[in-house]
UniProtKB/Swiss-Prot annotation:
Official protein name in the record: Thiamine-phosphate synthase
Catalysed reactions listed for this entry: 2-[(2R,5Z)-2-carboxy-4-methylthiazol-5(2H)-ylidene]ethyl phosphate + 4-amino-2-methyl-5-(diphosphooxymethyl)pyrimidine + 2 H(+) = thiamine phosphate + CO2 + diphosphate; 2-(2-carboxy-4-methylthiazol-5-yl)ethyl phosphate + 4-amino-2-methyl-5-(diphosphooxymethyl)pyrimidine + 2 H(+) = thiamine phosphate + CO2 + diphosphate; 4-methyl-5-(2-phosphooxyethyl)-thiazole + 4-amino-2-methyl-5-(diphosphooxymethyl)pyrimidine + H(+) = thiamine phosphate + diphosphate
Chain residues that bind 2-[(2R,5Z)-2-carboxy-4-methylthiazol-5(2H)-ylidene]ethyl phosphate: 137-139, 167
NCBIfam families: thiE
Keywords: Magnesium, Metal-binding, Thiamine biosynthesis, Transferase
Organism of provenance: Alcanivorax borkumensis (strain ATCC 700651 / DSM 11573 / NCIMB 13689 / SK2)
Gene responsible for this protein: thiE
CDD domains tied to this protein: TMP_TenI
Lineage: Bacteria, Pseudomonadati, Pseudomonadota, Gammaproteobacteria, Oceanospirillales
Length: 217
């Protein structure tokens, strides 16, 4: 599995910010700006539409040598030959996802700010652990908060890469990277921008944080 490539800016789409007609241009702007991973997250589209868009996004990601991850749907990830899937605590388990995707695909798991959940995910075979929210989140304002101290502990405790999420922007991303996060997952600070030029500029700012702060792939 290409875990050595799990490093840098992790862009996550949002149907409220990237409606269907804007999805591909917005995603490409983030990739031009240096996003190394892109997760397709849309629980409102029809299965046919999701398959169509996922296939397009996979092709686009691979043009930019980025990893393509599908949110919460191992079957769709397998269908479009995605690089992996991200599952939450309320979604199907890691074993079920692994059975569908095989051993060569990435499986990431939401662990919130809970080291016990992270330990369970690590033991079950997760390839990366998503921790957060670390800052006030536009997308999930009611998500339980997590501390930088917890992030440092998770990065030291687990051999799996830790992805930090929740209210991440160019101003606070360095704190997460310096605490050990190999990647920062971003929604609103990217796709909440006014146009594709602004999305690309925000992606460049976020990507630059990995050049000037301590983080190792």
């Amino acid at each position: 599995m290409p875990l050595h490539r799990l490093h840098g800016l992790y862009a996550i789409t949002d149907p409220a910010l990237t409606p269907d007609e804007h999805l591909l241009p917005a995603a490409e702007a983030a990739l031009r700006g240096g996003a190394k991973l892109l997760q397709y997250r849309d629980k409102t589209a029809s299965p046919t539409q999701r398959e169509y868009r996922a296939a397009q996004l996979r092709q686009l990601c691979h043009q930019y040598h980025a990893l393509f991850i599908v949110n919460d749907d191992p079957a769709l990830a397998a269908q479009v030959n995605a690089d992996g899937v991200h599952i939450g605590q309320s979604d199907g388990g890691i074993k079920a996802a692994r059975d569908q995707l095989g051993g060569s695909r990435i499986i990431g798991v939401t662990c919130h700010g809970d080291l016990t959940l992270a330990a369970r995910a690590a033991e079950a075979g997760a390839d990366y652990l998503a921790m957060g929210r670390f800052f006030t989140s536009h997308t999930k304002p009611l998500a339980p908060p997590a501390s930088l101290a917890l992030l440092r502990q998770a990065c030291q405790q687990f051999h799996q890469p830790v992805v930090a999420i929740g209210g991440v922007n160019p101003d606070n991303a360095p704190q997460l990277i310096n605490a050990g996060a190999v990647s920062v997952a971003v929604i609103h600070a990217l796709f909440g921008q006014t146009d594709t030029d602004a999305i690309e500029a925000a992606a460049r700012q976020l990507s630059a944080c990995f050049q000037t702060n301590r983080s190792a792939p």
